[in-house]
A protein has these predicted regions:
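Predominantly flavin-linked oxidoreductase catalytic cores and closely associated redox partners
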Residues: 115-116, 120-319
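Glycine-rich FAD pyrophosphate-binding loop
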Residues: 8, 24-50
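N-terminal glycine-rich dinucleotide-binding loop that anchors FAD/FMN and/or NAD(P) in oxidoreductases
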Residues: 43-76
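Beta1/beta-strand and adjacent pyrophosphate-binding region of the FAD-binding site
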Residues: 2-15
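A conserved FAD-binding loop/helix module that cradles the flavin
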Residues: 187-197, 202, 402-428
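Short beta-strand to alpha-helix junction loop
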Residues: 76-84, 104-123, 187-194, 217, ...
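Residue-level recognition of phosphate/Mg2+-coordinating polar/acidic sites
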Residues: 40, 61-64, 81, 87-105, ...
Length: 428
């Protein structure tokens, strides 16, 4: 091993900063530099959780990691034995960021401001002597005979900064080449395959990157008139598959959002992509999978309120606007009496409450957390060190790997965990 180890961290996001900080603590004599292609670091951390930074989750409601990590759950289970959500919670509190856990088990800084996390990471890295270079975009990696890795950067002229201020409206770029003994790729998820070219050129297999965590566009105009309505909890599923999710559902001016939809989009990411985001979604508005219990509930309403109008009694306390919409969707008049429903009407009502179908016509955005599934195949990675099996001295952390999660702080937890593991081994 050389006396002075030069380490490059490519990507100034959550995984990159965590890897750099842990590497510097474990290998204090190493020269470590974070290279970020944009003019500011930790941009995604800044906007996650609506700017409050949902940095992890208590995992109290997760019985199987596959619930949280549709892809990569086996690796995360293995790595959590070394650095899990409790370690991350303690790490930030020990580094000066008090945290709070909400009722939904999401963890935020007490300040409710993502800059508390950003300042902690940037200041800790600087204090330890980690260098930070913005406006450096990696364009090529070459293996040298002395086992170093030669990195080629496209550098935007004008000094990069941490605040995000642009140095010029039309920056001029130059090419720079630097050799390093160790390199960690922490560039996050990429929506385009060509973004992985310098890694596939080295021989890495790339799982096709496609969107995950998105909302659904719904064709039904009358349904979209219910925008702003929240129903919680519900079950969502895709008929003909085992894909399902649960949680609150938000009706928007374009269709459906909320955890019940975002979770489903994550678990069904590849299926939805293969079907060009044109599918049917089933909504169980009453969050009850036992149809017999729903039937008992409806019969109870009829017995207790035979002369009442449908509109006046809301099963399962459904929101008024949604209930009126469902009545009309069934072809019933709101003034119809409960005693007039009959067996056929009751069966239709039960079906509507438990298996209400809508046509999905494309996906919307989830601006708080842009996530892709796909990336570097885990088959190419040493699962203990996260070093490449294809290219020695090259490591990976974060969403650049084929790991992704549902919303709720799980993606950032994967960044902390994989960054920590890389920081333990990159200087060995």
């Amino acid at each position: 091993m050389p006396q002075s180890l030069h380490i490059a961290i490519i990507g100034g996001g959550a995984a990159g900063f965590f890897a750099a900080i842990e590497a510097k603590r474990n290998f204090p004599h190493a020269d470590i530099t974070i290279f970020e292609k944009n003019s500011k670091v930790l941009a995604k951390v800044e906007i996650t959780g609506g700017g409050r930074c949902n940095l992890t989750n208590s995992f109290e409601e997760i019985s199987d990691l596959k619930q949280a990590y549709p892809r990569g759950h086996k690796l995360m289970k293995r790595l959590f034995k070394r650095f899990d959500y409790q370690h991350a919670f303690d790490w930030f509190e020990e580094n000066g960021v008090p945290l709070v856990t909400q009722e939904d088990q999401c963890v935020f800084p007490q300040s409710q401001d993502s800059h508390s996390i950003i300042d902690c990471l940037v200041n800790t890295a600087k204090r330890l002597g980690v260098k930070i270079q913005c406006n450096h975009q990696l364009t090529a990696i070459t293996e040298l005979e002395d086992e170093r890795l030669l990195l080629e950067f496209k550098v935007s002229k004008g000094k990069g900064n941490l605040s995000g201020a642009s140095s010029a409206s039309h920056p001029v770029s130059e090419i720079k080449q630097i050799a390093f003994h160790r390199v960690a790729i922490t560039t996050g998820g990429h929506p385009k395959m060509e973004s992985f070219k310098h890694l596939s050129d080295l021989g890495h297999a790339i799982e096709l990157p496609i969107p995950s965590l998105f909302t659904f566009n719904i064709a039904d105009k009358a349904f979209k008139n219910l925008m702003g309505t929240v129903v919680e909890p519900v079950y969502t599923s895709i008929p003909g598959t085992k894909l399902k999710a649960e949680g609150p559902l938000l009706i928007t001016h374009w269709g459906m959002s909320g955890p019940a939809v975002l979770k489903l989009s994550s678990h069904a990411a590849r299926y939805l992509h293969e079907n060009n985001y044109q599918i049917k979604i089933s909504v169980n508005w009453v969050h009850e999978s036992n149809r017999s219990l729903v039937e008992e509930n409806i019969q109870g309403i009829i017995i207790a309120n035979p002369q009442k109008q449908l509109a006046s009694i809301r099963p399962y306390n459904l929101p008024s606007r949604l209930w009126l919409f469902l009545i009309q969707k069934m072809g019933c008049a709101p003034e119809k009496k409960w005693s007039e429903m009959g067996k056929k009407g009751c069966n239709l009502l039960i079906e509507t409450l438990t298996n209400d179908l809508y046509q999905v016509n494309g996906k919307g955005a989830f601006k708080e957390e842009f996530v892709t599934c796909g990336g570097i195949s885990l088959n190419n990675i040493d699962l203990h060190t996260l070093e490449s099996k294809v290219c020695p001295h090259l490591f990976f952390a974060g969403e650049v790997l084929d790991i992704d999660a549902i919303t709720g702080g799980f993606n950032l937890q994967a960044a902390w965990t994989t960054g920590y593991v890389v920081g333990q081994h990159i200087g060995e």
